[in-house]
Amino acid sequence: MPEAQVVVNIGPGKDITLSTGKICKLANGSCVTRMGDTTVLSAACSGAAKPGQDFFPLQVDYREKYSAAGRFPGGYIKREGRPSDKEILICRMADRPIRPLFPEGFFDEVQVCGLLLAADGINDGDVLSMLGASCALCLSDLPFQGPIGALRVGMINGEYIANPTNEEMEKSSIELVYAGLPDKVIMIEGEAKECSEAELEGAMRFANEIVKKMCAAQVELMEKAGRPKKDPELHIVPEDMAAALKSVTGEKLENACLIPGKEARMKALDEIQAEAVEALKAEYEEKYGEEDFMFFLKMGFDKLVQKIIRTAILEKGYRPDGRGVTDLRPLTADVNVLPVVHGSGLFRRGETQALVIATLGGPQDAQETDLITGGVATKKFYLHYNFPNYSVGEVGRIAGPGRREIGHGNLAERSVKQVIPADFPYTIRCVSEIMSSNGSTSMASVCGATLALMDAGVPIKSPVVGISCGLVTDDTGKELILTDIIGAEDHYGDMDFKVCGTLDGITGFQLDLKLPGISIDTLARAMAQNKEARAKIHGVVRDCIPAPRPELSPRAPQMEVVKINPDKIGALIGTGGKNIKEITESTGAQVDIADDGSVSILAQNKAVLEEVKRKVQFYTAEAEIGKIYRGVVKTVRDFGAFVEILPGQDGLLHISEMANYRVQQVSDICKEGDYLTVKVIDIEKGSGKIRLSRKAALDELDK
């Protein structure tokens, strides 16, 4: 592979360099993508299809190593381990736009690996990895029908920005990750601060113009250094067997495909498939062999079901569960469904049901992530999504969260976090437990999280709800957008477009396609249809709980932030942490101290909170002129004694101020460790030195 490179300008002072041929020469295709000093290697390799495999085993991987930023991994083990959530999310984001661009029936193993080689802390490597994955596949001999372009779009003061820096993203009201062909969109994902549909559409059209440049640059690089494409081996059901399968299933299969209930429909389809196996086994098992016979039959049966469902939708507007094109499934919403917990919400849409639990905590419960590409990120709100086997009535391996669960939780989290006030002091964790599933569980999680937060008394700005729209097309260009898709429509349809938002705007979105791209116009129509559906769901949520509860759940911990003089932080902590340890151990409260003097207190109840506040005030109190204190003698000198009147605050009690008579020796009045009643008679400006008088204190107390 000869060395070659191209440069794409995506905005003022923003160039992306794509190069190949210098490193990673044994891969089918490789590319080094660079923007600023952030550099990502992408490599594509392939292997033969496994016997009996009836799907495309594309694997996309992305890793960020600390060495890319000139750092060591933290902790005892100085080596990176399992992928982080961020890396997993980038893998999913890179997978979705390239998967539809391989030919149907191509089942070879394909692996695309992204590796962050250098991180400048300004530009993130995620969209560079997506672009590099496309370029590596284009340069390879694999039957990839690209190239695609990929970039992030932000919006600051109404102006769109391509691949904004980390600093620019903090000011942006939209974060759109866009991937597509020169004339079509394939994947979008992101979040927004209640943006309008028009603003999101504008961001997509802005991104599409840059994608055209990216695709042209990759074509140029392919001409310089690309490998010739090989003819792929496609696994397609033989025509004779496909015709025989259609004949034996006939009208019975058509009727079964349109049974409204998921469980009843799946049972009927399984029975018909079993009958087809028995009917065709004798003839075709001998012809193709036992393994290939079952392979072709399952694939052919699935194709028949797909065609029946799609034809019914397109030609008759008839969906598998009997709804109209824009109809929603039956909706219900409940709150306060569990005891003990801080907040809970149960949201049901048809056969999909999500139970979400909200838990409130303090600053110590926030999640800190050391981002290699740009500092430490602290999350005060996080949402975890769990999809157990019983939610689909199946038995399976029980393990930790997979990529899908991490991805669904992230979408719901990004969508809901937009309405949580920035000054809300609590850390919040929402856990979505999917009770049953027939499509759009992530959107049910968004609705359930809104219910749980409002039940817990979290003062969210506005309820957030979500809904998914699907798409069915044919070869003539006819297309139909479906509102609130079920599992079968997701599986056999062309699109899963999730949009979340309040009544004022969009907060989160994600597009998955099986087609090699659709027009932005089609996506804009889907957004309009989605908006109408969200308004109906908002009505259901508000009927259940019109607004957040006026007070936090009585089961939630009490939290308050008090301000102290930053100079008193040392006094509050104490020598070796003595004071702060005494506070936390005696009360069981969490106390977090910020550099600006903000002290966050998290206590189990109001009484404990007040006790902690009293202790904080005691350790951080300022000496006042004219006030009498009971202090302990810390040091004795010939000229007087130093008395600690407040934690960390000593004052000089001069020998002349010890009594109403002449004191010959300090030891006649006190020794170290004695307690004395003294009055502050002066505090020196600038130095803050305190002068004390026992004589004045005794005179005042005798009055």
Model-derived features: positions:
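Mobile "lid/hinge" segments at catalytic clefts and subdomain interfaces of large enzymes
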Residues: 141-260, 453-550
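Extended amphipathic alpha-helical scaffolds
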Residues: 1-46, 233-376, 557-571, 579, ...
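Alpha/propeptide regions of enzymes that mature by internal proteolysis
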Residues: 1-7, 11-14, 28, 39, ...
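Single-stranded RNA-binding regions, centering on S1/OB-family and related RNA-binding modules
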Residues: 555-559, 566-703
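Conserved helix-loop functional segments at active or binding sites
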Residues: 96-104, 139, 362-365, 388-393, ...
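Conserved phosphate/anionic-ligand binding catalytic regions in large, soluble enzymes, centered on
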Residues: 29-31, 123-141, 335-358, 438-458, ...
